[in-house]
Amino acid sequence: MLDIHHGDNLDVLARLGDASFDLIYIDPPFNTGRAQTRTSWKATRVAKGGRVAFNGARYTQVRTGSSSFSDVFDDYLGFLGPRLVEARRLLTPTGSLFVHLDFREVHYAKVMLDQLFGRSSFINEIIWAYDYGGRTNKRWSPKHDNILWYARDPRHFTFNVGATDRVPYLAPGLAGAEKAARGKVPTDTWWHTIVSPTGKEKTGYPTQKPLGILERIVRVHSNPGDRLLDFFAGSGSFGDAADRNGRDCVLVDSSRTAIAVMKRRFKGRPVQLHTTESRSTRSRREK
């Protein structure tokens, strides 16, 4: 079951019970200092003009829409901190929190998480590496994201390593034929392409993360029937990964665009939709 909540995540989190989630993953805004925008395109066959495909057919691209959100914060940690406090409260004794960021804020967030959870509760930093997009000649081009893993209790947490997908050896000739055919358990560096702008997985939502990354987290760090949470849900990819693997998931986002994307994405699946009035709106109405 997927529960989708439309509202400020801090208001929604306050209504959820203590120790009620086995796994929490969040992909908050990265504080890039600019608007994040994704434009959707559809290829349409034409008789003349346009571009020529491999089979000789001609097509043109038609813009079908776009979505965007502001990614600018004057006090980023002041925004994120109260939500991380709530996340810790919501974790079960064997639960884990995954915080997906990039180079801009990850180091500051880690210091705050160390203070909140305790340094011993920091288990791993996972590097998601990809090779796509623009480059710069002014510095080394950043081509990775950082995912911080914290356990509610560093002595007891779910880690089903046997449930993970296996990846190819970088030097299969050195591993031997049998090992090369079987592949290896991933390390803390995960090479995975971004969501293709023209692939079936795309939703048109900015900053959408690939299912391959999220399904690995779901399978290894939770069990079938567990309850999961993503309170920066965006396009709903974490909920999709949870649902595909037999987990219940609560998804929260304040963006109408995100809610619309998730409603389209999960059409035909068992979904409950809730709207939570913000505290500021409620206080204005009650005056």
What are these regions (language model features)?
Residues 2-3, 265-287:
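SAM-dependent methyltransferase catalytic region
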Residues 1-270:
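Core catalytic lobe of class I
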